[in-house]
Amino acid sequence: MNSTEFTEDVEEVLKSITVKVETEAEDAALDCSVNSRTSEKHSVDSVLTALQDSSKRKQLVSDGLLDSVPGVKRRRLIPEALLAGMRNRENSSPCQGNGEQAGRGRSLGNVWPGEEEPCNDATTPSYKKPLYGISHKIMEKKNPPSGDLLNVYELFEKANASNSPSSLRLLNEPQKRDCGSTGAGTDNDPNIYFLIQKMFYMLNTLTSNMSQLHSKVDLLSLEVSRIKKQVSPTEMVAKFQPPPEYQLTAAELKQIVDQSLSGGDLACRLLVQLFPELFSDVDFSRGCSACGFAAKRKLESLHLQLIRNYVEVYYPSVKDTAVWQAECLPQLNDFFSRFWAQREMEDSQPSGQVASFFEAEQVDPGHFLDNKDQEEALSLDRSSTIASDHVVDTQDLTEFLDEASSPGEFAVFLLHRLFPELFDHRKLGEQYSCYGDGGKQELDPQRLQIIRNYTEIYFPDMQEEEAWLQQCAQRINDELEGLGLDAGSEGDPPRDDCYDSSSLPDDISVVKVEDSFEGERPGRRSKKIWLVPIDFDKLEIPQPDFEVPGADCLLSKEQLRSIYESSLSIGNFASRLLVHLFPELFTHENLRKQYNCSGSLGKKQLDPSRIKLIRHYVQLLYPRAKNDRVWTLEFVGKLDERCRRRDTEQRRSYQQQRKVHVPGPECRDLTSYAINPERFREEFEGPPLPPERSSKDFCKIPLDELVVPSPDFPVPSPYLLSDKEVREIVQQSLSVGNFAARLLVRLFPELFTAENLRLQYNHSGACNKKQLDPTRLRLIRHYVEAVYPVEKMEEVWHYECIPSIDERCRRPNRKKCDILKKAKKVEK
């Protein structure tokens, strides 16, 4: 662009401004006042004079300086216009000042062509929106000016972007309001103009900073891309030599494997063994020094890679990334998260003791580490075995769940566990209630909250406040009130006259525990809850006054003592008597599932004589059982539930029998190897693992020859699986139990949603839960029998499949896998 073209453009701008000012003068009645128009015209004249001077001086400059001069003059124009506006604002009335600012805004809007479209109607302003400048500026970037306006736009905008007059326009455009409203606003707050000016200044500064930040991000992205191009694909997997303390010998690894039940369990044990620092609070109590954000532990990729390398030795299927992500990785994350969630719960307690989160039979870490680290490992073991009074062992929780027929009973078990001081010889419990109702003292809210947390985990319905108060809090209060009925000297025999039916509450307590006698039973260290002790030496056992099926049914004093001392509660004592007096029902055939006490629900009735004998022994040690209502409400349900429930002892025995001890290469030392999957594949290629441990050898029939017969019972068509689908699930499964659990996800898609409805279900409907659809459960067993035909299918189903199904219902959501995606397709 030469000087002649620039002069012509400026003259066109001057003409357009003059026309608009004259039109506005004719319609002065529509605006504010003549004075405002006069001052507006003066301000326009000053701007025109500045432009004319600029154009005249422009002609004297050589062509080589065309890019710099307009920028200089424009920078000089902006402060001049601002100073003129400030003077007019100070020397005129609010209304006049507003008119001047509005006029100046319109005139400057015409001075800078290309930043707004021409307006045909001179009486109507071309813009009336607040923050017009911001939105219009965005449109300018998207739609660059065209035609004759482009040249002037390049002169005043592109020459020096940092000095754009848009800031002046932004300062003046908020003034474009009607005179009356603006005048009133100015009277109320004379500093509004300066506030708006400061606001837009801050916005411009923020925009500039964000632009710089985006530029730096772009540079970093380019640098990362450049580095990625230099790294060859073969070098993407890092080969690292772990430090000596993270290396295990073959014998040490085999010792851990022998204690593991699955690949995920082995991974968790290796996590504890190799990285004990992840489970300590040393140097981890501080948060971020800059922002104060609390630090959070997590498993790093090197941790996981080292664990995976060891797991692959005994579980080759883990070499498949999909198997690792579906079976081991979720269990690792769940184990690690549960540990720290429990640790946070302990830290919230007043006592600073550390709980034993791991199993009591855990192998001493000193055997696995080098001699130089034995002292450190032993100190870690000592610190990890300090029992906390506020943490319940996993074994205890399992037994509580087996015994509890309702959330209230489960809460009562936890009450005895966490508040042992209320149930000793002092009988302090009758002075307390959950929340201090009835003028009694309030239970420790922190320990009570722990009870509620445990109850909500296993009984999700208790998350509702009303359900908790009605079923659990009321049950706890009844238990505490019932201590007054049981008060009496320990030496005196219990009296029968204090147990009449009129004195019994609606919900009868069957738990009578004592925590102070734990030292007398060294063989049961994991037990924390006991029945009230009874001196069997002084106890006289009368003969029953009814006919007994045989003399072998009668129990001696020593037999009663043994059963009583191994029981968790008086209800558990009755269940153990059932097992002892009905041995024919507790075999591998599981005939007990066909029986109950009353013969209802299509089942057979248990022998009434032996049931009567059970009651005879129970009421001998627990006189409340003489009341028919107590016996029916509390004990009959326990006996029926024991008939439904699987035999825990039999299952443990079955697992012990099928546990495979893989012959490990003791002569080879893993420390001589770099932790490399390829080296492991070469050195540890041995005989195939048993079906329970390998997905490849899990199915008894070759997959190519697998043909699943059609079920001989009616099944809805959406739940029927093709042979191809069954083969895919078999390939993804690690054991027959895992296969059943995957079929559960496949056939019950409605339970595996965000609502977690599966937490309310289990296989049998025990523990106050709903029963899964029997038809689909029967279909799961049909598929299991098809791919895993064995002689003792009943054992496999009860000790492998049912526990896996129940565990899958209890387990929280984990990372989605292919089987879950297919389940969603079926739901659609």
From Swiss-Prot:
Tissue-by-tissue expression: Expressed at least in heart, kidney, liver, ovary and spleen, with highest levels in spleen and lowest in heart. Expressed on the surface of T-cells.
Residues carrying Phosphoserine: S164, S379, S489
Molecular function GO labels:
rDNA binding
Q: Where is the BEN domain?
A: 242-343, 387-487, 548-650, 715-816
Where does the record put the Glycyl lysine isopeptide (Lys-Gly) (interchain with G-Cter in SUMO) cross-link? K20, K512
Q: Which Pfam families match?
A: BEN
SMART domains (alphabetical): BEN
Motif segment (Nuclear localization signal):
56-58
| Localization terms from the record | Nucleus; Nucleus, Nucleolus
State how changing R57A affects the protein, per the record: Loss of nuclear localization
The alphabetized UniProt keywords are: Chromatin regulator, DNA-binding, Isopeptide bond, Nucleus, Phosphoprotein, Repeat, Repressor, Transcription, Transcription regulation, Ubl conjugation
Q: Where is this region: Disordered?
A: 164-184, 483-504
Superkingdom to which the source organism belongs: Eukaryota
InterPro entries in the record, alphabetically? BEN_domain, BEND3
Q: Quick one: effect of changing K20R?
A: Partial loss of sumoylation. Almost complete loss of sumoylation, partial loss of transcription repression, no effect on subcellular location, loss of rDNA silencing
User: Which BP terms in the Gene Ontology apply to this protein?
Assistant: DNA methylation-dependent constitutive heterochromatin formation; negative regulation of transcription by RNA polymerase II; positive regulation of ATP metabolic process; protein homooligomerization; rDNA heterochromatin formation
Q: Where is this cross-link: Glycyl lysine isopeptide (Lys-Gly) (interchain with G-Cter in SUMO1)?
A: K20
Q: Which GO terms describe its cellular component?
A: heterochromatin; nucleolus; nucleoplasm
Question: Where does cross-link Glycyl lysine isopeptide (Lys-Gly) (interchain with G-Cter in SUMO2) occur?
Answer: 20, 41, 56, 58, 73, 128-129, 137, 142, 158, 176, 427, 512, 528, 700
Q: What post-translational modification does the entry describe? A: Sumoylated at Lys-20 by SUMO1 and at Lys-512 by SUMO1, SUMO2 and SUMO3. Sumoylation probably occurs sequentially, with that of Lys-20 preceding that of Lys-512. It does not alter association with heterochromatin, but is required for the repression of transcription.
Q: What do we know about how this protein assembles, alone or with others?
A: Homooligomer, probably a homooctamer. Interacts with HDAC2 and HDAC3, but not HDAC1. Interacts with SALL4. Interacts with SMARCA5/SNF2H, BAZ2A/TIP5 and USP21. Interacts with the nucleosome remodeling and histone deacetylase (NuRD) repressor complex. Interacts (via BEN domains 1 and 3) with ERCC6L (via N-terminal TPR repeat); the interaction is direct.
Summarize the protein's role: Transcriptional repressor which associates with the NoRC (nucleolar remodeling complex) complex and plays a key role in repressing rDNA transcription. The sumoylated form modulates the stability of the NoRC complex component BAZ2A/TIP5 by controlling its USP21-mediated deubiquitination. Binds to unmethylated major satellite DNA and is involved in the recruitment of the Polycomb repressive complex 2 (PRC2) to major satellites. Stimulates the ERCC6L translocase and ATPase activities.
Q: What is known of its domains?
A: The BEN domain 4 is necessary and sufficient for the localization of BEND3 to heterochromatic regions.
Q: What is this protein called?
A: BEN domain-containing protein 3
Species of provenance: Homo sapiens (Human)
